[in-house]
Design a protein with these regions (language model features):
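Mature, structured domains of secreted/extracytosolic soluble proteins
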Residues: 1-185
Length: 185
């Protein structure tokens, strides 16, 4: 997805997602959807595109399910009209916050936060973050995209014991695994 989003962009410039994600300067938070979450969304998107091209619905659904399940889905030329660099980059940057957001700093009431998409669309409402504490520990957390009908669960690792976290630390930020692809529109 990153390579498709960076099509036509030099990887050594700040406009490149490769640069943002590998540079030690910016602190970021990544909401990383599971493979299943991406497959479900892509299957729907590809099915709709194939039906629009005249492919019968059952055939379109079968082809879409196959294409969405391959690791090469973002580099399949037949899908370039559906998965344009602009669309893919919009989805990827919508999953990135421009600061580190650890679970223990999440609000207990749904609160909107800007994503890196806001650098291109300043008026976009961003994502909504929320968590539930049981004593001093986070027991549940969600992130919701503006076009998602329901909030995505942040998958909390049950270890380290006795209370887990989803905070996966990296040199330039933190990653939280989520169960849906966040949809900006």
């Amino acid at each position: 997805a990153i390579n498709r989003a960076d099509s036509g962009v030099a990887p050594t410039t700040s406009a490149s997602l490769v640069w943002v994600l590998s540079n030690f300067g910016p602190n970021i938070t990544v909401f990383a959807p599971t493979n299943l979450a991406f497959q479900q969304l892509l299957t729907v998107q590809i099915t709709q595109a194939l039906i629009a091209q005249g492919v019968p619905p059952l055939t379109a659904a079968a082809q879409a399910a196959f294409l969405a399940s391959t690791p090469a889905v973002f580099s399949t030329p037949a899908l370039y009209p559906v998965l344009t660099p602009t669309v893919v980059k919009g989805i990827v940057v919508y999953h990135l916050l421009g600061s580190r957001a650890f679970l223990n700093n999440f609000p207990t009431a749904a609160t909107s936060y800007p994503t890196l998409l806001n650098s291109a669309v300043p008026t976009h409402p961003g994502v909504s973050l929320n968590c539930t504490f049981t004593g001093p520990f986070v027991s549940a957390a969600t992130v919701k995209g503006i076009a998602n009908p329901t909030a995505s669960n942040i998958l909390i690792n049950p270890t380290p014991e006795p209370n887990g976290t989803s905070d996966q630390f990296f040199v330039n930020g933190v990653i939280h695994k989520i169960d849906q692809v966040l949809r900006p529109q």
